[in-house]
């Protein structure tokens, strides 16, 4: 019924570009952990309405294949992927800018558009928003802790039950950076035009160093073990041995399958009064530069894929997490997990999307490992990370 209404609306109101006359094909790539079957169903409905065949594929090593194939003038017309590679691909000439109209801009969260902004232009259409948060077992935690000082106290109170308060993959920047960012750290500063500037780094601000000290204190106090990994965190939480973990919406299904009644809250603050700021990841669709059907790709995305009716079909296949579309989010906001994740995202910062972002992940992962293993002080480790990010 939903599909029929969408098809009728498009057939009556949408004038497809002249290119669309004839046996044309629109090729879409998306990662294999997303709702590609739902996306294909949306494409099939578009094909019935337009006469343009839509083929959805989910290749292995999709980003490598995208770069290789598009660089050779082949590959998909549309590539749906998180925003953090957009700057790299824009600089390499692999994708083209998009120019959504005022109405479409207003239908989608501003922060989601901002994630796809690079050098003053937009390079993708947002579908869904992800942000990591504190996932807590309600049977063990009545009120989620606001600070990591509270976490240390909670860990002591759980000792009698032979439980641990928290675990996360703390040597990975994606999961630990929020506590440093909340304390005043930043990845890259901005130039006079508001663009991220790789020559300005803020991973070693005084606040970031204080947050690094808190991470070390969590280790030395015994609240966190040394050398934890993601799999240990997830399995411990599923068994009810760990009260809280730091992860994203992708971890919800496993917790549900384990019959854990859980809540989602902001990551505790390293410094009181300085809330953590999670990285925000935005799944979106980009148009490949070599595509010969760019107008059709835009028509499909803007007037079909981004509509709530189509997003519902994809979400029914594999949950999108938090929809970037405001109207569809409003429908799902009754779910406390989705509502909490949106609030976390609204107070977070988009993961950097410039080509130089790779320097941050490499340097910061090494710094976190040096801190948690006791190889370097937080000050020395973060100063070293800043120096590596600035090295040419």
Residue spans of the language-model regions?
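Extracytoplasmic/periplasmic substrate-recognition and gating elements
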Residues: 22, 44, 49, 122, ...
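Extracytoplasmic/periplasmic solute-binding protein
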Residues: 123-127, 132, 152-200, 242
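Glycine-centered hinge/linker elements that transmit conformational signals in sensory
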Residues: 155, 197-227
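A structural signal for short loop-to-beta-strand junctions that line the ligand-binding cleft
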Residues: 76-77, 105-138, 165, 274-277, ...
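Conserved C-terminal helix/tail region of periplasmic/extracytoplasmic solute-binding proteins
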Residues: 343-392
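Mature extracytoplasmic/periplasmic domains
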Residues: 95, 250-253, 283-358, 379
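Hinge/lid segment of periplasmic solute-binding proteins
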Residues: 83-132, 143-154, 179, 263-265, ...
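Conserved N-terminal structural module of periplasmic/extracytoplasmic solute-binding proteins
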Residues: 16-88, 271-273, 380, 384-392
């Amino acid at each position: 019924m939903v599909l029929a209404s969408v098809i009728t609306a498009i057939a009556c109101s949408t004038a497809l570009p002249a290119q669309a006359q004839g046996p044309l094909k629109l090729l879409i790539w998306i990662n294999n952990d997303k709702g590609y079957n739902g996306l294909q169903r949306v494409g099939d409905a578009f094909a019935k309405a337009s006469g343009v065949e839509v083929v959805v594929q989910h290749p292995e090593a999709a980003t490598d294949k995208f770069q290789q194939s598009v660089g050779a003038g082949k590959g998909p017309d549309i590539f749906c992927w998180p925003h953090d590679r957009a700057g790299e691909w824009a600089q390499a000439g692999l994708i083209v800018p998009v120019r959504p109209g005022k109405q479409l801009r207003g239908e989608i969260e501003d922060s989601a558009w901002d994630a796809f902004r690079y050098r003053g232009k937009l390079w993708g259409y947002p579908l869904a928003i992800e942000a990591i948060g504190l996932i807590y077992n309600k049977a063990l935690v009545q009120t989620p802790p606001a600070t990591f000082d509270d976490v240390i106290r909670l860990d002591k109170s759980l000792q009698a039950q032979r439980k641990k308060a928290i675990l996360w993959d703390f040597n990975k920047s994606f999961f630990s950076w929020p506590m440093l960012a909340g304390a005043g750290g930043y990845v890259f500063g901005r130039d006079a035009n508001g663009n991220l500037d790789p020559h300005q780094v803020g991973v070693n601000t005084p606040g970031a160093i204080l947050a690094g000290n808190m991470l070390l204190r969590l280790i030395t106090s015994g609240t966190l073990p040394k050398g934890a990994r993601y799999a240990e965190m997830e399995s411990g939480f599923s068994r009810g041995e760990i009260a809280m973990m730091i992860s994203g919406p992708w971890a919800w299904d496993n917790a549900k399958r384990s019959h854990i009644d859980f809540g989602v809250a902001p990551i505790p603050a390293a410094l009181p009064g300085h809330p953590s700021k999670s990285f925000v990841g935005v799944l979106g669709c980009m148009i490949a530069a070599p595509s010969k059907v760019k107008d059709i790709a835009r028509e499909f995305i803007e007037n079909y894929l981004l509509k709530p009716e189509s997003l519902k079909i994809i979400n029914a296949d594999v949950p999108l997490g938090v929809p970037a579309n405001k109207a569809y989010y409003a429908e799902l906001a009754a779910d406390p997990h989705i509502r909490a994740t949106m609030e976390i995202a609204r107070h977070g910062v988009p993961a950097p999307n410039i080509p130089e972002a790779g320097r941050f992940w490499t340097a910061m992962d090494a710094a976190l490992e040096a801190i948690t293993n006791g190889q370097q002080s937080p000050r020395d480790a973060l100063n070293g990370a800043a120096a590596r990010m600035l090295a040419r």
